[in-house]
Structure formats: C-alpha cells, structure tokens
Amino acid sequence: MHKVVLLRHGESLWNMENRFTGWTDVDLSPKGIEEARESGKTLKAEGYTFDCAFTSVLKRAIRTLWIVLDELDRMWIPVYKSWRLNERHYGALQGLNKAETAKKYGEEQVKIWRRSVDVRPPALEKDDPRYPGFDPRYADLSEEEIPLTENLIDTINRVIPYWESTIAPTIKSGKKVLIVAHGNSLRGLVKYLDNLSKQEIMELNIPTGIPLVYELDDDLKPIRHYYLADEEKVKEKKELVENQGKIQGNS
C-alpha cells in the first residue's frame, strides 16, 4: 500500500478578499500562514514524513510547502515545481470579486464558472497584462500550452499527464510524497483518482490547509481517503469555499 498526502495551500490574500485568483501570483494571508503551520504540526503529530514534494510555480503553494516542511524539519528534501499543478486559469475573471461578479451575472452563473467541468470563463486577450505569456516563469511553454482561460477538463488535461509521468512513478518507487497545490488542480486529481462524475465533482470543495490522505494499492487505485482533521472543521472550511461565489460575499 502507498500513501500520498494532498494539501491545498493556506488562505491567500485574494481568498481573503474573495477574488478570483487563478494564475495570479498572490501570497498567503496571515491566516493562510497559520493554516500552513497547523498543517505541518498535524502531519508531524500524526507521524508523517516525506521523501520528496511536488508543488506549482505559484508562491501561495510554494510558501505553504516551505512552512509545512519547516515544521517537519524536512526542508532538505527534493521539491519539484511544475506549472501543471497551477490553479485553474480563470481568464478575464482573475482579480474580480466573486460576490460582485455574482451580483452582475447571478449566483448560478458564477457557480457554473467555478464548479462546472466543461464551461470556461471569459478568456483573456493576449495583450492583457495578466496574460501568462509575459511572465518569465512560463518562458519554456509553447503558445498552445499557455491558457487564456480554462475549465476543469483543461486543468485535468495538464495535471494528469504530470501525475502519470512523474508523480505516480515516484510513489510506485516507494517514496513518500506530499503534493501541495490548489483547489482546482487538486479537484482534478481527485476526480481522476476517484473516477467522479460531472455532478459529483461540481459539488466537491477542497478546504484550504487541511491534509487529505489517499491510501492507494499497488496500481495506485484508491483504497480510502480521509482528512487529518475532525469532520466539523472540514465541513466548516468546505462551506467557506462554497460560499465564496454567493452574493453575500465573504462568509
């Protein structure tokens, strides 16, 4: 049996402001730093240790990983960063307040943009300052690989090849792996691992800063999964994520 731990980064500054973030490189909020620290403490208390870690190229995930590894006294382990683990690209919605967007377009439309599998938000133009092609961290990507917007399927289509080519062989080799990523890149991975339907993935929320453990068989098929937190805390934090797209705003 293998175990892999998935962790959504701690609350970011734009999570705090209830804004669509996507590939925008915002940092952790003070609460997010504390969530990351608590994740590290929880993993340490439960006896978890890691041989290597995978994360995105966005600082909210990278910093969460740094803090967790610091708590575990494992800052020396290899860390592999890939744009393929980035958050879903929210196109022209990036930077907009979710509650204000819900007022303008309706809560149902915002829920579809945020949660559906195959609907893309309005796209960026290539001359928009937010276009990732202007960012040096994506200099090695082809124009076709750089998104102007993404739905969840698009996100899955970049996450899963990285899982299959790089992360899965690492797990199969016997290494203990930690993946620190984002709400939608992790939703995509969970959909793949658990073979979830469109409706099931639309209702799935992954809370910030709570380790999610997957126990996998030798073929990396899930045996079971669980959060390292009590059910009430998980429920409360999932509801926070769900309520971000509502007209009431932050809740």
Curated annotation (Swiss-Prot):
Binding residues annotated for substrate, in chain numbering: 8-15, 21-22, 60, 87-90, 98, 114-115, 183-184
Annotated catalysed reactions: (2R)-2-phosphoglycerate = (2R)-3-phosphoglycerate
Transmembrane spans: none
A single BP term in Gene Ontology: gluconeogenesis
Highest taxon of source: Bacteria
Pathway: Carbohydrate degradation; glycolysis; pyruvate from D-glyceraldehyde 3-phosphate: step 3/5
Site (Transition state stabilizer): 182
Active site: 9, 87
Classification via InterPro entries: His_Pase_superF_clade-1, His_PPase_superfam, PG/BPGM_mutase_AS, Phosphogly_mut1
Protein name in the entry: 2,3-bisphosphoglycerate-dependent phosphoglycerate mutase
Organism of origin: Thermoanaerobacter pseudethanolicus (strain ATCC 33223 / 39E)
